[in-house]
Amino acid sequence: MAISKEDVLEYISNLSVLELSELVKEFEEKFGVSAAPVMIAGGAAAGGAAAAAEEKTEFDIVLTDGGAKKIEVIKIVRALTGLGLKEAKDAVEQTPSTLKEGVAKAEAEEAKKQLEEAGAKVELK
């Protein structure tokens, strides 16, 4: 009687985690392979997936709520972005609004701190 792939899969699916771990180790020894995931460098899709797995280094500063002290928040938005008064006012009043994109982590956290101290709600994406 020949064993089919389905029989093998059924047998493996009934193993406990410990038994499965031992089986993987035996496969590695017998066939000289490793069960570690392979990192593929190259294409844009692979690069994006690898970047997502690592710690994020660039952030978008998104103002989700201008808060009660809108004048203070507008002043900070103008200082951070270089926007004119009308544009900064619109950004604060029409939330959510992205204030800056692709900002370094330290700069993004500092901007978030300043805006939150003025009463605004901010997300780093």
From Swiss-Prot:
Keywords: Ribonucleoprotein, Ribosomal protein
GO MF terms, alphabetically ordered: mRNA binding; structural constituent of ribosome
Keyword ATP-binding in annotation: no
Assigned GO CC terms: cytosolic large ribosomal subunit
Signal peptide: none
Pfam families given in the database record: Ribosomal_L12, Ribosomal_L12_N
Domain of life: Bacteria
BP terms from Gene Ontology: translation
Keyword Transmembrane helix: no
Function: Forms part of the ribosomal stalk which helps the ribosome interact with GTP-bound translation factors. Is thus essential for accurate translation.
Assembly: Homodimer. Part of the ribosomal stalk of the 50S ribosomal subunit. Forms a multimeric L10(L12)X complex, where L10 forms an elongated spine to which 2 to 4 L12 dimers bind in a sequential fashion. Binds GTP-bound translation factors.
The family this protein is said to belong to: Belongs to the bacterial ribosomal protein bL12 family.
Name of protein: Large ribosomal subunit protein bL12
Source species: Campylobacter jejuni (strain RM1221)
